[in-house]
Amino acid sequence: MGVTKKPDLNDPVLRAKLAKGMGHNYYGEPAWPNDLLYIFPVVILGTIACTVGLAVLEPSMIGEPADPFATPLEILPEWYFFPVFQILRTVPNKLLGVLLMVSVPTGLLTVPFLENVNKFQNPFRRPVATTVFLIGTAVALCLGIGATLPIEKSLTLGLF
């Protein structure tokens, strides 16, 4: 692989060519209106038609059909709601549970204002944000794991 020489922009011949537009890609067809008005809608409508066609002709069953007369013992939410579900399940007062749920995004919104004087992007030079992140991740993991266990074992995660 050879070394490419950078163009000398002080060369009058090169400057004259650049002034005429010779240094740019001047062949081919323009993107407007050809691509944007004719090719893009064909691709977008073709993608939508393929998706709708597959959904109509080959519907996939999502699990087994629901039985309205057989209710499971404990209804669990989706996995990403496990920490919030665990908060609501373990706190006896409903108002306190809702306040704890509201405190999570409120606490996350206050983190940038705690370290607004620190302009570093390195997490090791931002101790408050790093500590909040690590503690929040550990608490969310413990709450999420606890939500999958029965209520008797959920607070101790079955370890004690």
From Swiss-Prot:
Lineage top rank: taxon: Eukaryota
A single GO BP: photosynthetic electron transport chain
One Pfam entry name: Cytochrom_B_C
Principal place of residence: plastid
Gene3D superfamilies: plastocyanin oxidoreductase (1.10.287.980), Single helix bin (1.20.5.510)
Keywords: Chloroplast, Electron transport, Membrane, Photosynthesis, Plastid, Thylakoid, Transmembrane, Transmembrane helix, Transport
This protein's GO CC annotations: chloroplast thylakoid membrane
HAMAP family tied to this protein: Cytb6_f_subIV (MF_01344)
Function of the molecule: Component of the cytochrome b6-f complex, which mediates electron transfer between photosystem II (PSII) and photosystem I (PSI), cyclic electron flow around PSI, and state transitions.
NCBIfam families with a match to the protein in the record: cytb6_f_IV
Protein name (database record): Cytochrome b6-f complex subunit 4
Source organism of the structure: Citrus sinensis
